[in-house]
A protein has these predicted regions:
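Bacterial N-terminal signal peptides that target proteins for export
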Residues: 1-8
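C-terminal motif of bacterial Sec signal peptides marking the signal peptidase cleavage site
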Residues: 17-20
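Interaction-mediating elements
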Residues: 22-324, 333
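Gram-negative/organellar outer-membrane beta-barrel architecture
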Residues: 180, 291-292, 311-492
Length: 492
């Protein structure tokens, strides 16, 4: 078999040498092989951060990799273009061997028609306009090579004047929305004097949308406001208006508050619900005599509260925290107006949660060997119980055992064949909360916070200054309790 491969590669080498390792012999008439780009020339480009960012984007837009590109570069090529040589040597053949060689080892040439510099310059000009260079232009030139069948490209970019934002006004919004925009003006993504940049303006529109949706505007969407730009009044600058559309559903112009929060707990997707447990903040619906999950656990994970304004960020956090418990196979939040009148401004929240399978079981088997001549098997078994005590806990059991014996002769003949063994077990309980000693109950902590606020009011201080900032966790805090034992008996 080795001799066959050597013969095959020797035959390929002879063919390549006989054809002179040509990279253009099979190029069709009227076509030229694209051999890369010369570095792009940037005319009148400044060194600002914005201009540097635009240049980096243009380098990507204008780039076309030639055959044998080094590290994906459009300007550097490897001197050994074996795939291209094989394609030129065998692509015009009609035998099965020729077709196999082209398919297995050949690389199709990159032609000038594929490089298509006209298309790249058009895309580049559009990019310049989107990034504020309205007068920018891009041209290219063909750079002939010694072989008339080969051609290089070189682009020239004239960026021109950078247009900036003269004013950015928010037009047509309601007084409540205007107040929100003014209160968060320091968070704006762009402002007067900044470069005119479509991507930055789009980020600002997205920020306004998120701001509204975090402050009760449940039905507001990004497409309900659009930009109007005036680049004529003051040359070199653009007056921009973010304007609310005229025909908008009235529900998007008022704030919505949370009323009832309903949680549907199912062990399977189509399980029927026949029991409801009412609480101060939650209504839990389930099947059976008692809830499969304690109310306190749900209250900790659901950050939307009765009487609060709707918040898209809290909705997303609630969804993430429910998923992070590890006890649900799927969760879904939905919001329903309490009635269909035009004055309605309250939403009922429905959280549909389907429990994952209650048990997981695994078994692992290994075979071990040591340089001392000892060999033997090892077995590990584990069982996990989800929601073990109706508090979202994960209860894990794990047992392991291993046995080994000595094979062959050893210096101590009496120990040859004698066995060693090991066995043990582990129990762990993972709680979806932090256990902090001496912290006190939630009722005690709330009472302590209430007294601090009352004392601040008595001193004439702003109560907001003594309120502690709410902790934000990117994952549900976990406490793990673990106990394990192991017995090892080793014999020399």
């Amino acid at each position: 078999m080795k001799q066959i491969y050597l013969f095959l590669w020797a035959a390929i080498g002879v063919v390549l040498l006989s054809t002179g390792c040509s990279s253009t012999s099979a190029i069709p008439d009227g076509e030229q092989l694209y051999t890369g780009m010369k570095p792009t020339e940037y005319v009148d480009a400044d060194k600002s951060e914005h201009a540097t960012s635009v240049r980096e984007e243009l380098d990507v837009v204008l780039a076309t990799k030639p055959n044998g590109s080094l590290f994906g570069s459009p300007t550097l090529q490897s001197p050994l273009k074996i795939g291209l040589w094989i394609w030129n040597a065998f692509s015009q053949g009609t035998t099965s061997f020729d077709k196999w060689m082209v398919k297995a080892f050949g690389t199709q040439p990159v032609l000038m028609s594929y490089a298509n510099p006209d298309l790249h310059t058009t895309v580049g000009r559009n990019l310049l306009k989107k990034r504020g260079y309205f007068n920018g232009d891009i041209s290219y030139s063909l750079v002939p090579q010694k072989n008339p069948k080969k051609m290089k490209l070189q682009y020239a970019v004239r960026m021109g004047q950078l247009w900036t934002i003269d004013t950015l006004d928010y037009v047509g919004f309601t007084p409540g929305q205007d107040s929100l925009i003014s209160a968060h003006a320091d968070e704006a993504m762009t402002r007067s004097g900044a470069p005119f940049d479509i991507s930055t303006l789009e980020s600002e529109r997205q920020r306004i949308t998120q701001l509204f949706r975090d402050n009760g505007y449940f039905y507001y969407e990004k497409g309900m406001a659009s930009y109007l730009a005036d680049s004529v009044s003051r040359p070199g600058t653009v007056a921009v208006n973010l304007q609310l559309l005229d025909s908008i559903d009235g529900r998007a112009l008022r704030t919505w508050t949370i009323r009832n929060i309903n949680v549907n707990l199912r062990r399977s997707l189509f399980e029927k619900i026949d029991t409801t447990s009412h609480g101060r903040s939650l209504r839990v619906h389930y099947n059976g005599t008692h809830s499969p999950l304690r109310r306190r656990v749900l209250s900790n994970q659901i950050k939307l509260k009765r009487g609060d304004l709707y918040s898209a960020s809290l909705q997303e956090e609630t969804q993430q925290r429910l998923n992070a418990t590890g006890i649900f196979s799927q969760t879904r939040l939905s919001f329903v107006p309490i009635d269909s009148t035009e004055q309605c401004s309250q939403l009922d929240v429905v959280a549909d949660c389907v429990f994952d399978k209650p048990y997981d079981f695994f078994i692992e088997a290994y075979g071990k060997g040591k340089t001392s001549g000892k060999f033997g098997p090892e077995l590990i078994m584990g069982l996990t119980k989800r929601n073990a005590f109706r508090g979202g806990e994960l209860l894990n059991f794990r047992v392991n055992g291993a046995f080994e014996w000595t094979w062959g002769r050893s210096d101590n003949q009496e120990s040859s064949g004698m066995s060693s063994y090991e066995y043990g077990g582990e129990v762990s309980l993972q709680l979806p909360r932090l256990l902090i000693p001496f912290r006190g109950t939630a009722k005690q902590r709330h009472e302590k916070a209430r007294r601090r606020i009352q004392e601040a009011i008595a001193r004439g201080e702003d109560p907001a200054t003594v309120r502690r900032r709410r902790k934000v966790y990117y994952e549900t805090p976990m406490t793990t309790l673990r106990a394990s034992t192991s017995v090892i008996n080793r014999k020399a």
